[in-house]
Swiss-Prot record:
Keywords (A to Z) from UniProt: ATP-binding, Kinase, Nucleotide biosynthesis, Nucleotide-binding, Transferase
Record lineage: Bacteria, Pseudomonadati, Pseudomonadota, Alphaproteobacteria, Acetobacterales
EC numbers for this chain: 2.7.4.9
GO biological process, one term: dUDP biosynthetic process
Gene Ontology molecular function: ATP binding; dTMP kinase activity
Gene (UniProt): tmk
NCBIfam families the UniProt entry points to: DTMP_kinase
The protein's name in its UniProt record: Thymidylate kinase
Family that this chain belongs to: Belongs to the thymidylate kinase family.
Amino acids binding ATP: G12, G13, E14, G15, A16, G17, K18, S19
Domain of life (superkingdom): Bacteria
Native organism: Gluconobacter oxydans (strain 621H) (Gluconobacter suboxydans)
Length: 214
């Protein structure tokens, strides 16, 4: 944690409702009188958004090393120009995806958990050495997620268009991450009603605020 703020990330597979729940969480915290920065990854700053467009919608396939480093480059700009300044001002930062998504998508999804890929990713992560105070892991079985994505429609990005085996590896990666760090990562059943999910997230944040003394 930097300054007096609180850094919260939301993680999970496609269709889990992270973006919606991040927005609702930010609104609820603002209603309680907190100053909140709502942001996302990859993205969150003009430079990082340019990298996001290349990663999600670019026409050229990248090597796994290049893809990891581009995520880290976007994250570095995001941290330096948005997240860290907000935390120093004492704000709560609510971020849709962060380090855990890179590990799940690039490490487990694309890299299939290969030791070489995980070692490279771990080294790159140490260069952008900053961790959330609290991570809210939205968990939703893949069939339910697919139904949501179909109902949502809209443009499909590079990761959403991957084969089912890719998404199963991503979900397995998120499960491994949550199991390895149960203090930081709080699992939330994203199959509940949106209101129930929002309530669970807000409760977890209140508990973290108490512990951190924010």
């Amino acid at each position: 944690m930097a300054g007096k703020g609180l850094f919260i990330t939301l993680e999970g597979g496609e269709g889990a409702g992270k973006s919606t729940q991040a927005r609702l969480l930010a609104e609820a915290l603002r209603a309680e009188g907190h100053k909140v920065l709502l942001t996302r990854e990859p993205g969150g700053t003009p430079g990082a958004e340019e990298i996001r467009n290349l990663l999600l919608f670019g026409k050229v396939d990248l090597s796994w090393r290049a893809e990891i480093l581009m995520h880290m480059a976007a994250r570095s700009d995001h941290l330096d120009n948005a997240i860290l300044p907000a935390l120093e001002r004492g704000e709560i930062v609510v971020c849709d995806r962060f380090h855990d998504s890179t590990l799940a998508y690039q490490g487990y999804g694309i890299g299939q958990g290969a030791p070489e890929v995980l070692a490279f990713l771990n080294g790159a992560r140490k260069l952008v050495d900053f961790e959330p105070d609290l991570t809210l892991m939205l968990e939703l079985p893949r069939p339910q997620a697919l139904a949501r994505l179909k109902a949502r429609g809209g443009q499909t990005d590079r990761y959403e268009a991957q084969a089912e085996a890719f998404h199963e590896r991503v979900l397995a990666g998120f499960d491994a991450i949550a199991s390895a760090d149960p203090v930081r990562v709080k699992r939330v059943d994203a199959g509940q009603t949106p209101e129930a999910v929002s309530a669970a997230l807000l409760q977890a944040v209140h508990e973290s605020l108490t512990v951190q003394g924010v």
